[in-house]
Amino acid sequence: MKYDFSHTEKKWQAYWQEHGTFQAEEGQEKPKYYVLDMFPYPSGSGLHVGHLEGYTASDIVARYRRSRGNNVLHPMGWDAFGLPAEQYAIKTGTHPSLTTENNIRSFRETLQAMGFSYDWSREINTTDPGYFRWTQWIFLKLYEMGLAYQSEVDVNWCVELRAVLANEEVEEKIAEGLTVVRRPLRQWVLKITAYAERLLLDLDGLDWPENVKQMQRNWIGRSEGVEVDFELRCHRKMLRVYTTRPDTLFGATYLVISPEHPMAEKLATAPQLVEVKNYISKAKLKTELERTGLQKDKTGVFTGSYAINPANGEALPVWISDFVLTSYGTGAIMSVPAHDSRDWEFAKKFGLPIVEVVKSPHDVQDAVYEGKDSTAVNSSNSEISLDGLAFPEAFERMASWLELKKCGERKVNYRLRDWIFSRQRYWGEPIPVKHYEDGSLGTETDLPLRLPEVEAYQPTETGESPLANIPEWLYGTDGKGAFRRETNTMPQWAGSCWYYLRFIDPRNSEHLVDAEKEHYWMNVDLYIGGAEHAVLHLLYARFWHKVLYDLKVVSTKEPFQKLFNQGMILGEDGEKMSKSRGNVIPADHVLEKYGADAVRLYEMFLGPLEQVKPWNTNGIEGVSRFLNRVWRLVHPDTEGPAAVLDEAAMPGELLRRMHKTVKKVREDTECLKFNTAIAEMMVFVNDLHRTGNRNREAIETLVLLLAPYAPHISEELWEALGHPESIARAPFPTFDPALAANDVLTIAVQVNGKLRGTFEAAKDASKEEMLEAARAVESVRKFIEGSTVVKEIVVPGKLINFAVK
C-alpha cells in the first residue's frame, strides 16, 4: 500500500475530533502539564509557514507529555480585538465582528489541518462578551485598588490611525512610516509602577531566556541614587535633581530640566523668555524616541537662571533640553560632562565647562571618561573630601553628607512608566465607567458592557472614539443621576493579559476561574512565543497576574514558569516574510502539496528551535522521502497489505541501537532539541533498512518515538500493526540504561602527568589496544619519540599516562 498523506490526515483528524482525544481531564489524579502558545491575532492574511513553527513545537511537547502520563492542557483561542479589523471596517463598512469571525474560521481550519492536539472544547475569543465581561471585571478591581486612574497626559498620537500608542509601540509604527506626535489627552492609566519592584525581583525565579529577563530588567530600569536640592539664585526655591552618581557632584557644571518641568518658563529671564517658549513648543511635538535617541543632535536653550551647587557653592547655569524627560526622576538632572557622554556632547556644543572629578587616563577636554574603576579627584570642601575614594565609598560618603546637610536624600527610581490604557477606537473592550454631571465617577454593575452597533468607525477629530457619536449608548441615568459613559476602549493587550486563566475554566459564568481548578493547573509549565513580546505582553500579563494574586484570585505569583522563544523562519530569500517582499509562503499551499506531517517534521528539522532559519522547499521534499521510508518498514509492498513482522528477539546490535535511539529522542524532546531528535530517528530508520530487519519491537518503538512529531502517519502505522486504540494514548518507549550506554569512550593521554591528547576507544578494548592507540595520537607521539618510556599506567576507560625520561 502506498502512503496517501491526504487521506490519512483527514481520517485521523476526524477521529480525534469525534473521540475528544485531546480534551484535558477534569480529574486531578494525574500530574498536570500546561503547555501554551501565545494565541494569535486572526488577521485577514491567514497563517504562513513561519507562524506554524511555535505551534508545532508546543504540540510535540503536549503529545509527548501525554505519552509520559501527564494530564495535559493544550488550548487555543483568539486575541481578536485590534486595529486591523477596525481599519478594514473603516474601508469597507464591514463590522469588525464579521471580519474577525471569518478570519478565525480560516485560522482554525489551518491549525486543525496541521493535526495540532488542541483541546478545542476550551476555545476562547477575547471579543466574546462572555470573555470580556471578566476583562472588564479585572479593570474595575484595578480601579477599586487605586491602580487605574485618569490623567491628562501627553500621549503618543498616531496621526494616520487617530489613536494613542503605548511607549512600547512607537518605534514599530514609525518604522512602518506612520506619523507619531505628542499631544495632551485625557487617558486612563494603570499604575504598573506600583509593582515595579516585585516585577523585577520575581524574574530571578523564572526559567526564561536570559535575554528576555534582561530586557524586562532594563525596561523596569531600577536605579539607586540621590535626589539633590540646588538653591535657585534669585528665586528663593529649590530645584531638585536625581542622580545615580552623587560622587561626581563636585564636577557638575550646569543643570538641565525637561521642557515640561513646571518651572521651565518660570526660570526664563526676560531676555530668554521668547526663545524658551519657542523651544518648549517644538519639544511638545516630538516623541520620546525622537527626544532620547543617543545619536540625535543635542538641542537646548539657556533659561538665564542659575542654581547653587551645594558641594562647592558654584553658580550653575540652568538649561532646558528635550533629552530630559519629566517622567523619569524629577525631570531635572545635574550634568557632569567629564564623566557622562551625553553631558560631554552637550557641553562641547554650548561651550560649557568640563571638570574632571574621577581620575581619568586621558584629558577629559578631549574625550569623556565614564569608568567607575578609578578614584575621585578635585572633590573636597571644608566639610567633606572624596579624593582618593573608589566609587562605592565615594557614593556613600556624599549621600550621607547630603542627608546630614538636609539638601539631599537617597532614592530608588524606575525607568518604567505607568501604562496608558486608553484607546480612542471602537473595536476594543468598553471601559465600564460612568461620568456624572457633578464630575464624580461610577462603575457599571451589569457586566458585560457591550459595544453598540455603529455606522461609522472613524475616530473623531477631537480624539474621542466613535462611541462618542452614539447618544443612545452614550447617555443614561441611574439612581445617582444622569451620566455619560466612558468612550475610550481598552488596548489590544487587555484580553491577552489573563487569557491563560480562562482556558482553565472557559465556561464559568460565576467566577473568572474556579479556585480549585486554578490551583491544580497554574502556573503554565511551558509558554512558547516570540521574544518581540518581552516588554509588552509578557510584562503586562505579569502585572495583572500579581494584582490577581493580591486579590486571591490566583495562587501563584507568576503566570509562566518556563518561557521559550522560537526563532523566526525566513523566506527562501533569507528575508523576513512579508507581503511587500512577496516572499510569504502560505501554510495552506505547503499543506496541500506535502501534508501536515512533512511540514511539522521539516520545520523542526530546519535547525535549533531558537535560531533564525530560512525556508528551503528542497528540504521539505527530503523529509517527505523520510516519511515514505518509515511507511515502507510496515508496507514494503506498495500494492499489498502490511508486512508480517518478525516476533523473535532482536539481534544484540539492533537492540542496543534501539535503546540508544529511545534515550536520545527522549532527552532531546524534553530539552526542545527537536532537530537532533529527528536526526536520531532518521539514523535508526537507515539502520532498519540497511539490515533488512523487520523486528516488531524495533518498528513499533520507532512509530511511538515518531508519534509526537508526525502523528498522522504514526496513527496509521500503529493501526496497521494491530493496535485498536489511538497511539495518542500509548506510553512513550522506555530504555535500558545499560543497553543505551555509549560503547565508545574518550581516553585522556598524559605524558609525565600532563595532558597531551585524547582518543576514542571501545569500552571493552584491551590494554594493549589502548596503548597502541595512545602512541598513535600525533600530539602525544612528539613527546615520547626519542625518549625512554620508563612506565605505562593504564586506568581502564579513563586515561593512560606515559612516564618518560
Curated annotation (Swiss-Prot):
Disulfide bonds: none annotated. GO terms for biological process: leucyl-tRNA aminoacylation. Its main location: cytoplasm. A motif ('HIGH' region) lies at residues 40-51. Gene3D superfamilies: 3.10.20.590, HUPs (3.40.50.620), Isoleucyl-tRNA Synthetase, Domain 1 (1.10.730.10). The keyword Coiled coil does not apply. GO terms for cellular component: cytosol. It comes from the Bacteria. The keyword Cytoplasm applies. Its EC number is 6.1.1.4. SUPFAM superfamilies: Anticodon-binding domain of a subclass of class I aminoacyl-tRNA synthetases (SSF47323), Nucleotidylyl transferase (SSF52374), ValRS/IleRS/LeuRS editing domain (SSF50677). ATP binds at residue 579. One of its GO terms (molecular function) is leucine-tRNA ligase activity. A motif ('KMSKS' region) lies at residues 576-580. It is found in: Cytoplasm. Keywords: Aminoacyl-tRNA synthetase, ATP-binding, Cytoplasm, Ligase, Nucleotide-binding, Protein biosynthesis. It catalyses: tRNA(Leu) + L-leucine + ATP = L-leucyl-tRNA(Leu) + AMP + diphosphate. Belongs to the class-I aminoacyl-tRNA synthetase family. This is Leucine--tRNA ligase. The gene is leuS.
